[in-house]
Amino acid sequence: MNAQKGFTLIELMIVIAIIGILAAIALPAYQDYIARAQVSEAFTLADGLKTSISTNRQNGRCFADGKDTAADGVDIITGKYGKATILEENPNTADGLICGIYYEFNTTGVSDKLIGKTIALKADEKAGKLVLETVNSKTTNVENKYLPSAFKKP
């Protein structure tokens, strides 16, 4: 009598079930990883605009050349997943002129978890850094788990 070679149907079904379970666990984790990577672009662009704000403040405004509105290419940077814009809050507030950066994600070409989401950052000039805060009525509505650890909301 010849010995059978190969796998039985039950063994193959068990392997397929295990692969399915692993895929069900890995897919959401991968989607979160993609969203976090896309959010990092916002902070990269904001870091470049932070330097512009510091230079622009020497002219007494948040925008380049002391203008009243953001100029494309100077105060507005378009990335692969969205657009970062310098904001200026009313200089007549008790705190004086407040500068910030507003990042808005594109409606296409980004993770489903980021469509229509925004990030608002205030330039803390004394500390020389950006902080997650409402600026000129613009807020952050990206889920906390996608933000870098230094910017997580309490």
UniProtKB/Swiss-Prot annotation:
<dbReference type="InterPro" id="IPR001082">
    <property type="entry name" value="Pilin"/>
</dbReference>
<comment type="subunit">
    <text>The pili are polar flexible filaments of about 5.4 nanometers diameter and 2.5 micrometers average length; they consist of only a single polypeptide chain arranged in a helical configuration of five subunits per turn in the assembled pilus.</text>
</comment>
<keyword id="KW-0281">Fimbrium</keyword>
<dbReference type="GO" id="GO:0044096">
    <property type="term" value="C:type IV pilus"/>
</dbReference>
<dbReference type="GO" id="GO:0043107">
    <property type="term" value="P:type IV pilus-dependent motility"/>
</dbReference>
<keyword id="KW-1133">Transmembrane helix</keyword>
<keyword id="KW-0812">Transmembrane</keyword>
<dbReference type="GO" id="GO:0007155">
    <property type="term" value="P:cell adhesion"/>
</dbReference>
<dbReference type="Pfam" id="PF00114">
    <property type="entry name" value="Pilin"/>
</dbReference>
<comment type="similarity">
    <text>Belongs to the N-Me-Phe pilin family.</text>
</comment>
<dbReference type="InterPro" id="IPR050470">
    <property type="entry name" value="T4P/T2SS_Core"/>
</dbReference>
<dbReference type="InterPro" id="IPR012902">
    <property type="entry name" value="N_methyl_site"/>
</dbReference>
<dbReference type="GO" id="GO:0016020">
    <property type="term" value="C:membrane"/>
</dbReference>
<dbReference type="Pfam" id="PF07963">
    <property type="entry name" value="N_methyl"/>
</dbReference>
<feature type="modified residue" description="N-methylphenylalanine">
    <location>
        <position position="7"/>
    </location>
</feature>
<feature type="propeptide" description="Leader sequence">
    <location>
        <begin position="1"/>
        <end position="6"/>
    </location>
</feature>
<protein>
    <recommendedName>
        <fullName>Fimbrial protein</fullName>
    </recommendedName>
</protein>
<dbReference type="InterPro" id="IPR045584">
    <property type="entry name" value="Pilin-like"/>
</dbReference>
<feature type="transmembrane region" description="Helical">
    <location>
        <begin position="7"/>
        <end position="29"/>
    </location>
</feature>
<keyword id="KW-0472">Membrane</keyword>
<keyword id="KW-0488">Methylation</keyword>
